[in-house]
Amino acid sequence: MASNLYIVHHEFRAGTSSKWWKTAYAAMAPGGGWDEAVGANKEKGFFNHSANAVTANGPLYCIWETKEGISIEEFQEFIDGPTGPGFGLSALMNICKPIDTSLMNGQTPYPRVFS
């Protein structure tokens, strides 16, 4: 069995996008803790391959990978939780869709991090 890949569709709750962007930019700035958060999430079995914003007010689309054995329910809990992409702000509504790589003859959008 292999790791799991997901497309996550994020929509901002009304009036929350500017606070989310401010928080995201602060986290990604030098000393903001981004690298540590990425490492901690990877240790727990979650890895974000890409984040793709359509506009500043959303939506955003991300490609995530989870290590083998993590259920879609556990992934949703992580995505909605304080260490997920919402930074604990309750700013995002998150729709997680598993990618069925068997439909594309095993092709993945990115090389797997968890093998």
Language-model segments: what does each one mean?
Residues 1-59, 65-77, 96-115:
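Short S/T/G/P-rich N-terminal loop/turn motif that feeds into the first structured element of a domain
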Residues 79-90:
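A common structural junction motif
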